[in-house]
Amino acid sequence: MIAGLGLSTCTPSDVSIPGAATIDVMNGFPDGESGYALGVSGCYAGKLGDFLLMAGGCNFPDKPVSEGGIKHYYKGIYIARVDDSSSLRWVKAGELPMEAAYGATVSLPDRLIFIGGSNSSDRFSSVLSFSFDCMKDSGLICETLPPLPHAVDNMSATLLGDTLYVLGGNRNGIPSSSMFSLCLDNYSAGWTEVPFPGRPRVQPVCSSLLGKLYVFGGFTSGGDASVSTDGLCYHPESGQWQVVKAPLTTKGEPLTLTGGASVSYGDVLLQYENNTSWQRPSKPTL
């Protein structure tokens, strides 16, 4: 699952996806930093081999923001082996270079890539690649990839072929309609900005499917504040965009996936939005 990362906690009950899979609640949460076990928002997370890995994130450990609480950011990196058990045993495997949240994570077969993010004082353009090395004490090795041209947070990211895409979010603190690409087979060439149509999209949902890139939802704040329900499909071979029909609720109403997540499952997208309902469209419809 990609994250543009929302909340890291699961729903309180099992969720059934007809014809696809069952989503089960897993027990266990990292507790290597004071306040972390309360649950965090905006963490970096993904699956690496037989392990889940999560890092960073933020919360209000002392009191909620409505009561004047102060948001705290974290930098711990935690891993847990995935097996047949319903419990996860987390071990702290290292730390990020800085406290961070609200970035994006992309999972590759042999590594996880953490992109951008922010904390209470800074916004980041950094791109970090994590992989396993059994010769290391923690097992984790971190490599630095070319940074984004701008600091970006609250965006989404996905891998399409050998190209990494980062879309939307806040660019240097301002809601953005930017998209950047990085070829992982030639990453020394750096990032390229890809023309992106339409309004800015902060906290969009982005995924790749059948050789195309899809983006849904997102919001923009300020005087022209709005929440997007429609989607867009990008064809990398032609560089063209097409409008995609909005996903619908069970009542047939347009649904925004802002702050949610999606994952490709065969030839469908499983789309998750932040009121914990799952959508399984038969295929994205152009």
Predicted regions, residues:
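Bacterial Sec-dependent signal peptides at the C-terminal "C-region" and cleavage site
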Residues: 3-17
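Terminal low-complexity, poorly structured segments
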Residues: 1-3, 244
